[in-house]
A protein has these predicted regions:
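Conserved small/polar residues in nucleotide/adenosyl-binding loops
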Residues: 155-161
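Short, surface-exposed basic-aromatic patches at helix termini and helix-loop junctions that form
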Residues: 39-42, 94-105
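Glycine-rich, highly charged phosphate/nucleotide-binding loops
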Residues: 59-71
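Gly/Ser/Thr-rich loops at beta-strand to alpha-helix junctions
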Residues: 25-32, 55-56, 83-93, 109-112, ...
Length: 165
């Protein structure tokens, strides 16, 4: 299966249909990792459909997009799994999945399920910030620019080349 480019994953998602009986509806930010797992295990019975990763910056778009995808694909698959945690939907995604009879990942967000939900819940504060290869390559588009934290340029400063003694 071809590796998708980051720009497509960020803005459009992807469809890795190979005739499987199970569909994974996932975040585009996790596409490469999921594709690697499918390939390594030769799981040809599983198809992957990813929503645009940029939805993490607009969590209100996740639930309607998952609902549309379930409606579009439900008849063509024996089982659909949603590879999202709550991801800022305020429980809306969980309620949708329960109503549709579709399983999803547990937890508040991917940081929690990466670490393990039980271990994550026991902590009073974050002890790790998880970066997938996708997020590292898309850090400007997903973090700096949307949060108004564009890196400060220090090119205007002149540093002394010799210290006075």
């Amino acid at each position: 299966m071809a590796t998708p480019n980051d720009q497509d994953l960020a803005l459009h998602g992807m469809n890795a249909k190979q005739g499987g009986k199970i569909l994974l509806l996932a975040c585009g930010a996790l596409a490469r990792e999921i594709l690697d797992i499918l390939t390594i295990n030769n799981w040809l019975h599983i198809d992957l459909q990813c929503l645009p990763a940029i939805f993490h910056n607009h969590p209100e778009k996740i639930t309607p997009a998952i609902e549309a995808a379930i409606g579009k694909y439900k008849q063509g698959y024996e089982k659909i799994f949603v590879v999202y945690a709550d991801c800022g939907t305020g429980g809306a995604l969980q309620r949708l999945c329960a109503a549709q009879g579709v399983e999803m990942l547990e937890g508040p967000h991917c940081y929690s399920f990466f670490e393990g939900n039980r271990q994550f819940a026991q902590r009073d504060e974050f002890t790790a910030f998880y970066l997938t290869d996708f997020l590292v390559r898309q850090f400007d588009a997903f973090i700096w620019k949307p949060l108004g934290l564009e890196p400060v340029s220090y090119t205007h400063l002149t540093l002394p080349t010799k210290l006075a003694v």
